[in-house]
């Protein structure tokens, strides 16, 4: 259809659409890599990925966090627990979000695989800025071999719940 066609609307129907009152944020963290060397002792922690998310324009936010990585095992034996933590303004310590995910290898393996999961965080306050961090913790016995966790990436999609449909931040969009 061109501008001379019948029914042409130069505003592309924008006048007929209602403005969306519930913004959505999509944010991706930067990929990173970490190596867990042979002989790493239990309780040793490694930060795999992180991102900071400002939900100040979202009322009653619901956040879906997605983690993906590419573990490379070289004669690796050991167990690593992986968990997401969040730390918001005015909090002194990070708070766990969702369950613990476990990568456990019982016999020496040289392998490449994917490790990914998603969780939802619906326990956030309005008008808050939080940093989400994915932490790996060695558990059980000392590790054997090496585990390289490559391209560890954390992403987030945040939007408001059905009960809240208007941005309360004081600026024009």
What feature does the model see in each segment?
Residues 2-173:
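Extracellular jelly-roll beta-sandwich "head" domains, especially the C-terminal globular C1q domain
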